[in-house]
């Protein structure tokens, strides 16, 4: 497990791999927005709100802990590891009613484009997970020599995480391998170029 990034709207980003039979066992939390992005394998979720679900690659699972809840994550396979990212954000208001959401995104949804997977709870999209904070998260799969440009607000902050799936990208003038991350501020655009035969999977965080 690695703690990465910096404290932007009190966000913690955790990259996890569980081998078979590994788990987080019933952790108790309140006043956190917690979402998991499954990269490979199967992740089993259980919580004190009676939610039980098996998550696979492409799934995003979200829990707003609000006034308080308990949850656990297990490797859902007895033979293969699971690799996922879990992000924790303090909500814009305290002691909200706990809630649970899941969304699924295909490879085509992310291929050579920015797929919005997490957005503020303002009704701007029905497909993404709704979060109680001014945060947007995009997922992408960028093929070799393909280019994408993201227009930025110079007053916001941006975080890029490249998933460790074999791909590489060039972000502006910086090369990023799998597992690498970059923090960007005071910019009006980000330029991404795929640099490997394997499509690069990455997440882009747009933060207040």
Residue locations for each model-derived region?
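Jelly-roll (double-stranded beta-helix
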Residues: 1-208
């Amino acid at each position: 497990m690695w703690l990465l990034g910096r404290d932007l709207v009190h966000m913690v980003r955790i990259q996890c791999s569980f081998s078979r039979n590994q788990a987080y066992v019933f952790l108790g939390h309140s006043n956190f927005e917690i979402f998991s992005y499954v990269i490979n394998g199967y992740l089993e979720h259980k919580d004190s709100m009676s939610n039980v679900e098996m998550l696979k690659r492409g799934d995003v699972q979200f829990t707003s802990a609000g006034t308080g809840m308990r949850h656990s994550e297990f490797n859902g396979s007895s033979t293969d590891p699971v690799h996922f990212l879990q992000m924790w954000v303090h909500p814009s208001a305290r002691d909200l009613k706990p809630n649970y959401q899941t969304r699924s995104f295909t490879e085509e949804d992310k291929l050579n484009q920015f797929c919005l997977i997490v957005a503020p709870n303002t009704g701007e999209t029905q497909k993404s997970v709704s979060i109680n904070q001014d945060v947007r998260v995009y997922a992408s799969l960028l093929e070799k020599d393909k280019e994408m440009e993201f227009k930025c607000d110079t007053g916001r902050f941006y975080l890029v995480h490249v998933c460790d799936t074999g791909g590489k990208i060039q972000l502006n003038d910086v090369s990023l391998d799998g597992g690498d991350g970059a923090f960007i501020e005071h910019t009006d655009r980000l330029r991404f170029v795929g640099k490997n035969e394997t499509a690069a999977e990455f997440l882009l965080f747009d933060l207040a």
